[in-house]
Amino acid sequence: WQGYFSYNEIKAVSESTNTLFAASENALFSKNTATNEIKTTNTIDGLSGQTISAVYHSVKFNKTVVGYENGLIIVINEADGKMLNVVDIISKQLPAELKRVNHFMEFDGIAYISCDFGIVQFNLASMQFGDTYFIGDNGAEIKVKQTALFNGFIYAATNSGIRRASITNKNLIDYNQWTTIVGGSWVSATTFGTDLYAINALGNIHKYNVGSNSFVNSIQL
């Protein structure tokens, strides 16, 4: 069989030293920037036909992790092309509409998975899930759009403020360990160079000010 998939509408991207990984609705492609070689991966190769919502490539483990709107995660071992379907999020006793995978962030061998209910740990070496963080008020579900690591803290952009906690805190499952830095609805938090930036639901870019522990300098997209 030969597959014909649209790669025009890119939903998520990730990169390694010399390769760019991109996801469309139900397929992946990668481009080696040194050789210009392009590789495609789709349902014929083993991907799910569900809608992709996030992608991340781990340079350390040479694995590409694909997240879906229904909570499915597929881990691709780039060394041999083998795929592992991980259904732990799908199996959680949560409403189906909260299981969407929004983003992956890696630290110390752990992928922190942002979902519409909170954050989940996934060990990239053992391929096993760890703790789940419900960081909403009083430990409620909260939509986490993206996380970023900055100055020893994990920052979570949510639909109810930007919240942070020490990445080395052993008790992050306790919502009391998370502090709200700013309220409002946020869609992104990311580092660029030596700075931390966040984008709110209105499309304004804010830069984090370490001295005042706040986000300032709004820029309209």
Regions found by a protein language model. Give the residues of each.
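Loop/turn residues immediately N-terminal
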Residues: 26-29, 69-74, 117-120, 159-163, ...
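A generic tandem-repeat structural signature
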Residues: 57-124
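Short loop/turn segments that connect beta-strands within beta-propeller blades
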Residues: 32-36, 77-81, 123-128, 166-171, ...
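Residue-level recognition of short loop/turn positions
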Residues: 17, 34-35, 60-61, 70, ...
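Short coil-to-beta transitions that initiate beta-strands within beta-rich domains
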Residues: 1-16, 42-61, 86-107, 131-151, ...
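Generic beta-strand structural signal
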Residues: 15, 23, 31-33, 57-59, ...
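Conserved beta-propeller blade signature
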Residues: 19-22, 63-66, 110-113, 153-156, ...
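Beta-propeller domains
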Residues: 23-43
